[in-house]
Amino acid sequence: GNISFMKIRKLKKGFTLVELVVVIAIIAILSTVSVVGYLGFTKKANVSGDKALVSQLNTILKTNESETGAKPATATEAIQIVAEQGINVDRLKPLTSKYTIAWNSEANEFTLLDEEGKVVSGTLSKTEHLNWLITSSDSVVENTTYSTYLMAGYKGKKTLSVKTGLDVGENTNVTSVTYTKDDEAKDVILRTNGGTLTVNADTDNVTHYGSSDRVNVKAVAKQSYHEYGKVAAIVVNAGHVVVEEGATVTAIVVPNTVSTSDVTIKSVVKDVNVYAPEEVKVDGGQKKGAASNVENIVSGAKNFAGGQGTEQDPYSIKTGEQALKMEKSKSGFYRLDNDIIVTDEIYLSKKQITLDLNGHSIALEYGKDVKPNNGSTLYVGGSNGKLTIIDSSESQKGTVYGSINTYPNKVTSAVRVGSNGTLEIYGGNFVGRSEGTSCIFVYTNIATSSAAKVYIYGGNFKTESPSDGKYFVLNHQDNATAGCVITVYGGTFKNYNPGVTVVDPVNAKTGKISLGEGCTTTSTTDGSDTFYTVTRA
């Protein structure tokens, strides 16, 4: 039994280098096997989860189809159907790395694809463009033979060129889409959110949903371009265009330079304005005659309620938002076609505007977060700035209302004229509504080179309350209107006689108010109010 000392020392000896290397190698092999096994297990679990999700999505789609008797028209609609059941596919990526989800519009079902694009669950249509890949890659959009749907939060290119279907989803940062034909003729669906859509595919039939500021139809197959969305203007160079039921289109334009034999237009919606040469066949819609300026018509359709900005066809204004867009619009003719309220002052500087009140009213009611600046509803000024106001209506009820709010050191007038501005009024009603305000107000500076000019040929003018017992219906800012003139040739003024006006103080720094040459004033009394009417002799 006893163990010798030498044997004990031998037993305590550690691993040799070779033995240690072998042990490490064994551990590495075991670790690799474990990791591979774990990853394999994880992938299987993810694939299983993705397949279960796709199955659930398809159950929802099929149930909806059974209940409604219709398939979704777009990928957006399909996604909205499942979203209503609490599943937001729009922001969903498969759990499995490099897998993707597609919507087969022919079968109306979602499909799970692996990293090679092979079907894992569901089916793909044999017609490639009827399959919609859900993606956030502009490279995929522009290079795949499938149609594509852009996931929310897309941060790719703003300008896209495609040869198959595209649905931009809820993204608004795609500002231009150009669709051109591929080798094979097809029927495609395009869905946009604003911006410009250009279609140039003489072998294809194109259906558009969503919205667009402008659609350029350069060429489509004889069967047609179908519009189901909300579009400001469709410019047609060739093809058959159909505005379908439920669509909103402000204007269709056929340039005078195109071959009219290549264009036909049909509109189920009857109030679409069509600008086209006489030879173009229009079925439905409202023929407005030839297009004098395509870009003006597009601008009118995009920013206003139609029109070309000409005297014969003014830009139509039906909302306060449209009225405010006059600020950034060009010189031209504008017409009110509704009573409107604007939430901010309208600046019409350095342009020539003719505004037809057309029997309607425009009133200033400041928005919640809007800070008053000059205080007037309409402002004109700047080099060559000219505002002409008329009322072409039989009723002559067109009215410009100033704000009802009273502010210290602000004159909340109906119209204000600034440096170098010119105002001409031929009709309408003008009302200053705040306490002690003016109706027409001029404010420039002490330099005569900045003088403003106001010429009144007709209309009715009043302020609702006096200032220190006086009504300042027409008014110059004291000491800051050198060389400015307000000349009255016609009109009726409540409690204010422009024929005997004395500007206070009378000095070279304050403008003048006077009657036109040969004009006279008569007056009538109604209770405590006196109305002064100016006429030419």
What is each of the regions a protein language model found here?
Residues G169-T172, K328-S329, I341-T354, L364-D391, ...:
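Extracellular beta-strand-rich solenoid/capping regions of secreted or surface-exposed proteins
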